[in-house]
């Protein structure tokens, strides 16, 4: 809906280029705004900056001159830029309007929105909703924090489509009129306190997701965190999910996902592993039911969706052994979730960059670990950990070598789990590269027929 006129002839300052700033600047120019882009980095050789300049958009880089505020612009801020940055801090003092580009996506599109936020699980929930839409004849376009710039996708959707948008707390701080038809808060734990300063500020940022909702909209949230999530501002119809008890919404009972007393699917038929993922699944299923996605499409998705790449991703089965790639587990909390996701014996591949951490906090989660294959800078620490718990420990040179060594010790029905609990930078440039090496090596060991 590029006939939106609310920004025509307005001065707008886009602070922070990156993908979202680039797309926001182009959109604002189409909407008739007088656009300036500012970035603290030198953009003199940046291709996107040159592209914007060719459109007549001013680009000021290398610093944040406060004179850019003299024409009282509306600020469109990159969500990763904290409010303590000089130009943003000064804009706040002057009372200037500060938005993020997801607000633009709402202003220009008539498509209903499913918005997903939370400390953990939001990417999985967003992706699963997208997969359920894909299995149906309906269209749900992914956008936001999941990697697709919301204001760009919003220009491409029809009013009959859904925008399925993942939102971080940073993005939610910059909304004014943004109103999802269906909002999901997966959970709220302590996080990003370096940005928000305290837990209360972080919680309030998450609650922004429902501040503009009305009685015709829906909020989906964790029943067991309802006191943290709900507030007097909440006007939407609230529905809950729970893996522990019957609730007004969706829940697990007798091993089935149940909605309004109707069994949808046996949890044993789900491909995505882990108790934490059960909550993610419940939230996604409920959102899709409310959006009109057929139950058959939902079931088709649940029996095939194996997760996000590198996040407890089901890679495949070799004979009776399932392999899981959790390379994104770069800290002990993520690995705790992974180890807690299986009842079968686990061969655990772990190790990586040594940041001076000890790993004793993983001991309570090692009950099902039968053997460990350790690698990287921390392999001695993990070997010590495994030996202290009476586990079989094998040392490997890297992830590829670890998968090779697994073949010597694997037994029927073992789960092979790469969950390093460490960053990858001692041996790999990214956790994605580490995960890809794991997958490649798994495939190399598949029997050829």
UniProtKB/Swiss-Prot annotation:
A GO term for molecular function: UDP-N-acetylmuramoylalanine-D-glutamate ligase activity
pH dependence: Optimum pH is 8.4-9.6.
Alphabetized InterPro entries for the sequence: Mur-like_cat_sf (IPR036565), Mur_ligase_C (IPR004101), Mur_ligase_C_dom_sf (IPR036615), Mur_ligase_cen (IPR013221), MurD (IPR005762)
Annotated Gene Ontology cellular component terms: cytoplasm
Top-tier EC class: ligase
Pathway: Cell wall biogenesis; peptidoglycan biosynthesis
Catalytic activity: UDP-N-acetyl-alpha-D-muramoyl-L-alanine + D-glutamate + ATP = UDP-N-acetyl-alpha-D-muramoyl-L-alanyl-D-glutamate + ADP + phosphate + H(+)
Record's protein name: UDP-N-acetylmuramoylalanine--D-glutamate ligase
Family in the record: Belongs to the MurCDEF family.
Residues given in the record as ATP binding sites: 118-124
Function description: Cell wall formation. Catalyzes the addition of glutamate to the nucleotide precursor UDP-N-acetylmuramoyl-L-alanine (UMA).
Matches recorded under SUPFAM superfamilies: MurCD N-terminal domain, MurD-like peptide ligases, catalytic domain, MurD-like peptide ligases, peptide-binding domain
Subcellular location: Cytoplasm
Provenance organism: Staphylococcus aureus (strain NCTC 8325 / PS 47)
GO BP terms, alphabetized: cell division; cell wall organization; peptidoglycan biosynthetic process; regulation of cell shape
């Amino acid at each position: 809906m590029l006939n939106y006129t609310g920004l025509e002839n307005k001065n707008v300052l886009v602070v922070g280029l990156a993908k979202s700033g680039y797309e926001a600047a182009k959109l604002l120019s189409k909407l008739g705004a007088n656009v300036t882009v500012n970035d603290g980095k030198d953009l003199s050789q940046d291709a996107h900056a040159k592209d914007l300049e060719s459109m007549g958009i001013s680009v000021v880089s290398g610093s944040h001159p406060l004179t850019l505020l003299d024409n009282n612009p509306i600020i469109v801020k990159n969500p990763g830029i904290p409010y303590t940055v000089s130009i943003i801090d000064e804009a706040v003092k002057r009372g200037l309007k500060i938005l993020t580009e997801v607000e633009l996506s709402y202003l220009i599109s008539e498509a209903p929105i499913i918005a997903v936020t939370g400390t953990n699980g939001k990417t999985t929930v967003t992706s699963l909703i997208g997969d359920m839409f894909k299995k149906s004849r309906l269209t749900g376009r992914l956008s936001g924090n999941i990697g697709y710039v919301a204001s760009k996708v919003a220009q491409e959707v029809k009013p009959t489509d859904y925008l399925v948008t993942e939102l971080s707390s940073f993005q939610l701080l910059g909304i004014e009129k943004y109103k999802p038809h269906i909002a999901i808060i997966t959970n709220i734990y302590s996080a990003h306190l370096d940005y928000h300063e305290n837990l209360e500020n972080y919680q309030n940022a998450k609650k922004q997701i429902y501040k503009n909702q009305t009685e015709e909209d829906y909020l989906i949230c964790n029943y067991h965190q309802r006191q943290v999530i709900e507030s007097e501002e909440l006007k939407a119809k609230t529905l809950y999910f729970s893996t522990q008890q019957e609730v007004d919404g969706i829940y697990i009972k007798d091993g089935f996902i149940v909605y309004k007393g109707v069994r949808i699917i046996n949890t044993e038929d789900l491909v995505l592993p882990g108790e934490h993922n059960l909550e993610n699944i419940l939230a996604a299923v409920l959102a899709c039911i409310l959006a009109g996605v057929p139950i058959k499409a939902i079931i088709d998705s649940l029996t095939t969706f194996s997760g996000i790449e590198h996040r407890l991703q089901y890679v495949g089965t070799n004979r009776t052994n399932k392999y899981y790639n959790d390379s994104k587990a770069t800290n002990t909390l993520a690995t705790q979730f992974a180890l807690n996701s299986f009842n079968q014996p686990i061969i655990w591949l772990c190790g990586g960059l040594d940041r001076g951490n000890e790993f004793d906090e993983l001991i309570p989660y090692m009950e099902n670990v039968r053997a460990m294959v350790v690698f990287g800078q921390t392999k001695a620490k993990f070997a010590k950990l495994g030996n202290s718990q009476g586990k079989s420990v094998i040392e490997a040179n890297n992830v590829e070598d670890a998968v090779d060594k697994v073949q010597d010790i694997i037994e029927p029905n073992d789960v092979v789990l790469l969950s390093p609990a460490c960053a990858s930078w001692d041996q790999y440039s990214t956790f994605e590269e580490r995960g890809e090496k794991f997958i490649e090596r798994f495939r190399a060991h598949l029997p050829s027929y």
